Amino acid sequence: PHTPTSCIVGSSDVYKRQLHDFGTRSTNEIEKDLLKFSKERKMELILPCLYSELEGSALPNIVEEISKTKYLDHIIVGLDRANEAQAKKAWKFFKKLKSPFSILWNDGPALKKLDKELKKKDLAPNELGKGRNVWYCLGMSIARDTARSVALHDCDIKTYDRRMLAKLFYPVVNPLFNFEFCKGYYPRVANNKMNGRVARLLVFPLLTALEKTIGRSDYIAVSYTHLTLPTKQDV
């Protein structure tokens, strides 16, 4: 599959369900709804990335796909591991986006100063990485105080298309739904094994259910070997 197969949504009572993509609605139809919803429910996208990803094969396509959307109010790019010259190049790179955007330069003097002040109050993240990047991006989103819904996703998804973004927003933006969060998932294959949420939340439970229903079989046993099995905490 080239797009997320499903998403998990939840509401305030911690009830969760999986919404599978059966392809019954086109991307254009979903985006048409989102554009209508955006008039009263502004949407903001967070893109945490490394500068090196600008030179990879995934992010240029992601930017191109996002540039085709019309429902986003604002985009926050969290830029990590970039010097001043690279930050300027990043600004030119993300100008391809059609929506208004801001770049949070995490290695810049302003962010370093803020990080230092927050550390004195024991409020800053202790470890460098994507978590810290997202933490500051969310802080910027809260400070802007314009978005009704915020989505974020990685910048290394090689099979990305704009349907993924539309499906992330749709369950939480649609006023007829009561969902407060949504997680998309899609196959991640490495070392001849399927990884990620699609293995943990879809394939593994499916194989377990089949095993309980029809009993042990060589086919199911072999299928397990092609998964990165979840830990007890994941299950």
Question: Model-predicted segments: where are they?
Answer:
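Short, small-residue-biased leader/transition segments that mark boundaries at the very start
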Residues: 1-15, 228-231
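N-proximal low-complexity "stem/linker" segments adjacent to membrane-targeting elements
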Residues: 12, 16-64
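Short loop->beta transition adjacent to catalytic acidic/histidine clusters or analogous donor-positioning motifs
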Residues: 42-43, 67-77, 100-101
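A conserved acidic beta->alpha catalytic loop
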Residues: 79-90, 99, 108-110
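Active-site-proximal specificity loops/subdomain of glycosyltransferases
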Residues: 95-144
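Short beta-strand-to-loop acidic/aromatic patch adjacent to the donor-nucleotide binding site
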Residues: 147-156
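Conserved donor-nucleotide/metal-binding helix-loop-beta segment in metal-dependent transferases, i.e.
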Residues: 162-181
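Short beta-strand-to-loop element that shapes/binds the nucleotide-sugar donor at the catalytic cleft/hinge
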Residues: 180-196
